[in-house]
Amino acid sequence: MISFPLGGIGAGSIGLGGRGQLRDWEIFNKPDKGNSLQYSFPSIWVQAEGAPAVAHVLEARIEPPYEGQNGLGSRNAPGLSRLEGATFTGEFPAAKVEFHDARLPVQVALEAGSPSFPSMLTSPAYQWLSCATACATPDELRLPFP
């Protein structure tokens, strides 16, 4: 399983998994590979005009082999609805997860970056992460993360 590190030097890190899940929360000077914080996940709620609302955890389905020696456990809320699939692409310092689900009336992708030092944020590699707050167009909503 992939765990793309998000975080700068001395800032700790959170891993972005291939399904779009947040994992390996290594913050507050605590190494924690393989661990996920309880109920720490983005979600999506969307409603097309004239259609029922749809809500999902914003990550692809959990597929075997399941994580952990005791299966899914309760930390990652396995009973909540997730998306059908995801495609992960990444080349340090940037990663992108494109989500796929026929039930969603929108296309969803998560883009994340990991600066090694603060001045990297002004480099061309980070131009696509330039929103200080949410950025939106008719086809795209961008939320800065992290």
Regions picked out by a protein language model, each given a short descriptive name:
Residues 1-146:
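Mature extracytoplasmic enzyme cores
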